[in-house]
């Protein structure tokens, strides 16, 4: 018998790792998973933000742990997955959300800055997918959600210009498809979310430059609101999307239509 809708979206008993889960859209998506019943392992680079979010979530009755992590360091990644298994016994969902950016014209882009962006936004996602994927393969089940960007679907035609960021997010979309193809027959689904403009630590630096354009040109003429990403995250994490893999869902108010 088919599950009803409540059952399809229910994450009770599931455990999710959320990178960059202490602030912004990462925190929002983690909140959504917890509201659907999931246990959380949050990782972030700054203890003050991580501790604040953990305390807030525990105050709401969520089952949540946290660990400091630099996603570009393999040892840190392995430590997060190990801690998750030790605490909760499984890794059912991974949200690869941690990211950085650096703006510069291509001819002025410092190689060191380029590499930092690639290391976090692309290599870090691969490292976490690899480590979590090994555990998911033992279970023959799992959902990996990579947080890409509409920057990976388009370009910075009107500036400001972010060659490293755009390349990293386009690469992440390609990695999403390849991981989906590699692991689909082994019970693991891999999808991506490509947000448009939402208020966050990264986006707030440029939102003022784009907000008028968004209001004039978007099909839905505004910046994304708080809460408009977590539903998509829960959908992709849950059995509601059990026949979906290798896809990138743009949540952008119609910007890429």
Locations of regions flagged by a protein language model:
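Substrate-binding pocket helix/loop in short-chain dehydrogenase/reductase
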Residues: 105-106, 110-118, 203, 211-214
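Residue(s) in the substrate-gating loop at a strand-loop-helix junction
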Residues: 149
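Short, small/polar-rich loop/turn modules that mediate ligand/substrate recognition or access, typified
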Residues: 184, 189, 244-246
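A conserved structural motif in NAD(P)-dependent oxidoreductases
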Residues: 218-229, 240
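Active-site helix of classical SDR
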Residues: 129, 165-168, 176
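The beta1-alpha1 cofactor-binding region of Rossmann-like NAD(H)/NADP(H)-dependent oxidoreductases
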Residues: 47, 68-80, 111, 227-228
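Conserved glycine-rich cofactor-binding loop
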Residues: 22-23
């Amino acid at each position: 018998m088919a599950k009803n809708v409540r059952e399809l979206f229910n994450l009770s008993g599931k455990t999710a790792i959320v990178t960059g889960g202490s602030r912004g859209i990462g925190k929002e998506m983690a909140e959504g998973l917890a509201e659907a019943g999931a246990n959380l392992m949050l990782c972030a680079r700054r203890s003050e933000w991580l501790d604040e979010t953990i305390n807030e979530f525990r105050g709401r009755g969520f089952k949540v742990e946290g660990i400091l992590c630099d996603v570009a360091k393999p040892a840190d990644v392995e430590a997060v997955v190990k801690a998750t298994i030790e605490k909760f016994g499984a890794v059912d969902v991974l949200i690869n959300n941690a990211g950085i950016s650096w703006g510069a014209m291509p001819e002025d882009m410092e190689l060191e800055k380029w590499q930092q962006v690639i290391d976090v936004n692309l290599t870090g996602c691969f490292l976490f997918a690899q480590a979590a994927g090994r555990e998911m393969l033992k279970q023959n089940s799992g959902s990996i959600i990579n947080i890409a960007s509409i920057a990976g679907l388009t370009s910075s035609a009107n500036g400001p210009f972010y060659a490293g960021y755009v390349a990293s997010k386009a690469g992440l979309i390609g990695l999403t498809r390849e991981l989906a193809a590699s692991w689909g027959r082994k019970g693991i689904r891999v999808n991506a979310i490509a947000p448009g403009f939402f208020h966050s630590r990264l986006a707030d630096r440029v939102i003022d430059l784009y907000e008028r354009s968004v209001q004039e040109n978007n099909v839905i003429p505004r910046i994304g609101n708080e809460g408009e990403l977590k539903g998509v995250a829960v959908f992709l994490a849950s059995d509601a999307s059990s026949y979906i893999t290798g896809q990138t869902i743009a949540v952008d108010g119609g910007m890429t239509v």
